[in-house]
Curated annotation (Swiss-Prot):
Name of the protein in question: Proteasome subunit alpha type-2
Gene that encodes it: Psma2
Organism this protein belongs to: Rattus norvegicus (Rat)
Taxonomic lineage of the native organism: Eukaryota, Metazoa, Chordata, Craniata, Vertebrata
Family: Belongs to the peptidase T1A family.
Task of the protein: Component of the 20S core proteasome complex involved in the proteolytic degradation of most intracellular proteins. This complex plays numerous essential roles within the cell by associating with different regulatory particles. Associated with two 19S regulatory particles, forms the 26S proteasome and thus participates in the ATP-dependent degradation of ubiquitinated proteins.
Keyword Coiled coil: no
């Protein structure tokens, strides 16, 4: 009850030391569609569930796995409109870096800058925190990277992680399956199997999205490729 009086104030700490609006933003993430990221020896895979709103909905009109640069991509769990704002901001930050330094932005630099934007929205008046967590993958300096950034602006590097609905089950599954020598092909299968742990209904190429990042860059798998991977694990 003591927290309730602070729940509408973004910039005021509650007596227990919480910013309650951030707690609510994290709840929005935990209720969002599951997403998985796995760093392999030779690349990174991102996978997510794409909920179909209606049989009349064109499921390929909006993507959840998005490229930021040729070598960086991301996915989210949480609120789609907030995600699109951050995708636009991330692309702009990457372009600004390139204009100044004449080289692609390193993955860790982009993560730091996007997380700073998210953190700014936890201490400014007239705004609210972003209701999304991001998984950001990239390839630079000859190696893969995987980061997670939360509504608070906190970010961490991961070997493999899951977020969104039933993320605890996803992380438990990954802890059992992950090893340091995992190849990208195996990581794709593992990512899809992790999603399957909490998937409701039939998994098809229309209701999941997969992105991969390796030495060749970042790309979203085509529906045909996803269908082939689903057939391989069936």
């Amino acid at each position: 009850m003591a927290e309730r009086g602070y729940s509408f104030s973004l910039t005021t700490f509650s007596p227990s030391g919480k910013l309650v609006q951030i707690e609510y933003a994290l709840a929005a993430v935990a209720g969002g569609a599951p997403s998985v990221g796995i760093k392999a020896a030779n690349g990174v895979v991102l996978a997510t569930e794409k909920k179909q709103k209606s049989i009349l909905y064109d499921e390929r009109s909006v993507h959840k796995v998005e490229p930021i640069t040729k070598h960086i991509g991301l996915v989210y769990s949480g609120m789609g409109p907030d995600y699109r704002v951050l995708v636009h901001r991330a692309r702009k930050l990457a372009q600004q870096y390139y204009l100044v330094y004449q080289e692609p932005i390193p993955t860790a630099q982009l993560v730091q800058r996007v997380a700073s934007v998210m953190q700014e929205y936890t201490q400014s008046g007239g705004v609210r925190p972003f209701g999304v967590s991001l998984l950001i993958c990239g390839w630079n300096e000859g190696r893969p990277y995987l980061f997670q950034s939360d509504p608070s602006g906190a970010y961490f590097a991961w070997k493999a992680t899951a977020m969104g609905k039933n993320y605890v089950n996803g992380k438990t599954f990954l802890e059992k399956r992950y090893n340091e020598d995992l190849e990208l092909e195996d990581a794709i299968h593992t990512a899809i199997l992790t999603l399957k742990e909490s998937f409701e209904g039939q998994m098809t190429e229309d209701n999941i999205e997969v992105g991969i990042c390796n030495e060749a860059g970042f790309r979203r798998l085509t529906p045909t490729e996803v269908r082939d991977y689903l057939a391989a694990i069936a």
